[in-house]
Amino acid sequence: MADSTDEVTAVPRMMVDIETLGLEPGSAILSIGAVQFTEDGLEEEFYAEVSLESCQEAGLEIDADTLEWWLGQDDEVTGILTGGDDLTHVLDEFRLWFPDDAEVWANSPSFDCEHLGVAFDAVGMSEPWAFYDERDVRTLKSLPGAANVEMEGNEHDALDDAKHQARFVVETLQNLDSAARTGVDA
């Protein structure tokens, strides 16, 4: 019989991060970054940039203040504003990549998962996770034993952010597990 730790680690864990042109659900999505992770580290990655035109055609909106903020960023970051693939194609590819019955982690699900849910609805698809599989990185940040993980890559790059958040979760869960095994406060 498997112990509860084996059962928990058997569930695929996916970290998701998006970049958008607005803070409200229904905003245009610029990019989706995601990475599968286990207690041992990062695994498969997903990254796609989304065409703003296809977002608008699907009914997603562009917030002028957020667009202005993006235009004030480094050239390396603002390149995301042009090009990209069709929203429907990107979301379909994401659904195909996303494993069944996986936990979806985000910082925070009320932003990333909700925005993605609205985008999936806009193109007539359902998101590839159930609401009860959403996990919040912010909860772990508030716990004793939360890891201090240095950012690698670029902030506001959806894949770099997803990988950073996943590394944080992996290290924090390792810290908490170690503390539980030794009976010491993390």
Functional labels for PLM-detected ranges:
Residues 2-14, 19-106, 152:
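Conserved non-catalytic scaffold segment of RNase H-like nuclease domains
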Residues 19-21, 35, 108-109, 114, ...:
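Anionic group-transfer/hydrolysis microenvironments
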Residues 22-24, 141, 166:
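Hydrophobic positions within alpha-helical membrane elements
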Residues 80, 93-96, 114, 118, ...:
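Residue-level signal for well-ordered alpha-helical scaffold segments within enzymatic catalytic domains
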Residues 95, 110-131:
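Substrate-recognition/cap helix-loop segment adjacent to the acidic, metal-dependent catalytic center
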Residues 103-109, 114-115, 146-186:
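Acidic, Mg2+-coordinating catalytic module of metal-dependent nucleases/exonucleases
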Residues 128-148:
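Short, flexible loop segments at boundaries between secondary-structure elements
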